[in-house]
Each structure stands twice: as structure tokens, then as C-alpha cells.
Amino acid sequence: MKKYSICIVGGGSRYTPDMLAMLCNQKERFPLRKIVLYDNESERQETVGNYAKILFKEYYPELEEVIWTTDEKEAFEDIDFALMQIRAGRLKMREKDEKISLKHGCLGQETCGAGGFAYGLRSVPAVIDLIKSIRTYSPKCWILNYSNPAAIVAEATKRVFPNDYRIINICDMPIAIMDIYAAVLGLKRRDLEPKYFGLNHFGWFTHILDKKTGENYLPKLREILKTPVDVQTEPLFQEKSWKSTFEFMSQMINDYDEYLPNTYLQYYLYPAKMRNKENPEYTRANEVMDGNEKETYERMHKIISLGKIHGTKYELTSDVGCHAEYIVDLATAIANNTNEIFLIITENKGTINNVSKDMMVEVPCRVGSNGVEPLVVGSIPAFYKGLMENQYAYEKLSVDACLEGSYQKALQALVLNRTVVNTDVAKELLKDLIEANKGYWNELH
């Protein structure tokens, strides 16, 4: 069986340790020869790299090569897979996005609203430059992109690399939601198969099927979830803001009686309520910096000081979180041509036959060694079509603004966003966001 070479782009990320653990767990199905960590933040990556040395010595001794580097040629040359998870500006810029949005009376969120717009205009140039570099050194490698905001990034990669079917854009949020459903049902997520349509962070489950029996659990789940439930899943989702998000799902299910919504729809359907719940002095970015990110690096530093994982409380388990599972499972499906079903962000091309053909939709797809094959969704009701067309117009204009350096397109994008709408507010937001993002955004004229 072939052994693959992979590069984790964003090697210093707090998500990387779980990804490395998942690669250990998956080594029989997805054997590796070489793992490269690439990041432009050498200090953070040094910590992850030293942790990786200990991890692989104990759990993956047959791995031939592990390196970490800030040099693109060294990182990207002759790789089979690039797993991308970059955050342009890191969490400090996310904090600015959220607090500037709240200052102007809009909700402050990472990927939605004005915060997501700002993040998108930082991410797109960085992702495009990295993909061009990867293609210089490994023209045929698979690029599996997790970088947020995934909807805007996917729209940009479609335009700049229109015929590159080996670029696949994904998001783990629907899978995280399915973990909740599985826990409610007393099942495992891998026992379930979703039918789903929408845009990234903007979609609906129409069926939750039992893979063995074909039973559709959606009606049962809707009834259960009309009342908030406290479900124990991975530690990240036990944080206060995530618990609040999952609890609010019951509000959406009671108000809209057809499907099961992606949790991010709370920001678009109840923007004032979401804004009023937020603390303008301490946002989700602060919570992450003080919580999960800090804890992740503290854990790695402790392992490095111990020099081992075996025989400590940090012993590797099979529970690594959906973020790591999803991208490694996707790479495994491509490598082994399994034709498994994944939720992928892909060009519509008639998959949903009554929305724009060029729309970047998030739908179930079969995935194998030839790439992604979307499964037909058909027509969707007017309410969902209207929401999606409006949101996609915002996403398109955001990418236009970035690639063309157009202030007018940026203003139009923000006014179309359901969390902003007001032109005067959008102008003030843009003024502050342009100032905050100097050095990250392409200049707007």
C-alpha cells in the first residue's frame, strides 16, 4: 500500500495536535511516509513540532520523516496532500472583527456578518498565495481546505483556480451537529447519513438516515430538540458559548417546522437577539484565547517537559474531535477510493435545480480518487431559496471586493448581509474595518 506525504498548512494551529493524533489512529487505512508542518509563526509551530516528535516516536515509529518549517519550498515539494487550516491575523484580529462589529450595533461573530466579511477579506489573499505556491511545488497534490470563512474562501478558489478539481473546501460544523444528533439518539455519528442542503454555515438537514435500516430520524429529533438538551460531546462544545448555541437550536426548531437548521442560522434569523447576548468587552475570541487555545499549548508544553505521552494522563485515545476526524477521513476516502459520502462545499451546477448554477453550495457528495461527485438535491422551497440567493450575493460581492479592490462592492456586500442591512452602519463599519485590517486586506478604492 502506498505511503503518502502530507503537509499541514497552519502547523502551529491549536487544531494541529488533534489532527496529528487522528493520523496516528488512521495509520492502517491512511499510511504516511512523511509529515510536514508549515506555518509562518515559527515559535508556535516549534511547540507543535516538538510535541509531534514525542507523539510519533511512541505511536507512529514507522513514520520515516517529520519536519516543521517556515520555508514554502521545503514544505510543499512532492507532497500528496495539503491540509489547510490557516487563520490570517490569528485570534487577535478575530477579536478586532468582533468588537468593531459590536461597537456599531451589529453582532460580533467569527464567520458571520461584518466579522466574517473582515475575516474573508484577510483569508482570500493568503489562501490564494498559498495554493499558488503549493501548485508550484506539487502540481497534482490534493488540497483539502478548512480555512474560514469557508464560503467566501470557496467562492474565491473557484474563480482563481476554476479547473482544479483537487482543491476541496470543507467545514466540520454539520458533522459537529450530527455528533449532537447521534448522542441524543444513543448512536454513533458514523451510524448516520445526512441529507442536507445550503451554503456553508447556512444550511438545513432534510433527513438523518440510519445507514443500516434506512430509518429517517429527523421527525424524532425535531420532537426531542424542541426542548433544550444538555448533550456531552467533545470538550470544545462544553464551553459556555457553544452550550448556549446548541441550546438555542430549540428556538429555531420551534419557529421553523420543516427541517433541522445549522446552528449558525441563529445569527441570520435572530441577529438582534444574538447581538444582545454578547459582551462587547469579552467576545468569543477572548474566550478561545483564554480557554481552548491556552489549554492546548499548556498541554503540549507539559508533554514536552515530560518527554513522553505513554504512561501519563495525556495517553492517546480514539476521541480526537470532529475537526481532525473529518479532514483525515476525507483524505483517507480519496486515497482509498471509498466513495463515501461527505458534506462538501462545491459548485452547484444544477445539484439544487432552482438556485444559481454558480452558487457554492454545501451538499452531500461521494468522494473518491477522482474527487467530488455531488448528489442531486432537486428543488428547494421558496423560503430557503430566498435566504440562500441573498446570502450568496453577499458572498460573491465580498469576493469581488477583495479581488477587484472595490469599496463599492464591499459596501454592497455588507448591506446585503442580514446582520447589517443599514447603509449608514455599513459605511461606518467599513471605515473601522479598513483601518484595522491595514496590511491584511487588498486596498479598496
UniProtKB/Swiss-Prot annotation:
PROSITE patterns: GLYCOSYL_HYDROL_F4. Induction: By maltose and methyl-alpha-D-glucoside. GO terms for biological process: carbohydrate metabolic process. NAD(+) binds at residues 4-71. The active site is at 172 (proton donor), 264 (proton acceptor). Pfam families: Glyco_hydro_4, Glyco_hydro_4C. Mn(2+) binds at residues 171, 201. Keywords: Glycosidase, Hydrolase, Manganese, Metal-binding, NAD. Its EC number is 3.2.1.-. Binds 1 NAD(+) per subunit. Belongs to the glycosyl hydrolase 4 family. This is Phospho-alpha-glucosidase PagL. It comes from Clostridium acetobutylicum (strain ATCC 824 / DSM 792 / JCM 1419 / IAM 19013 / LMG 5710 / NBRC 13948 / NRRL B-527 / VKM B-1787 / 2291 / W).
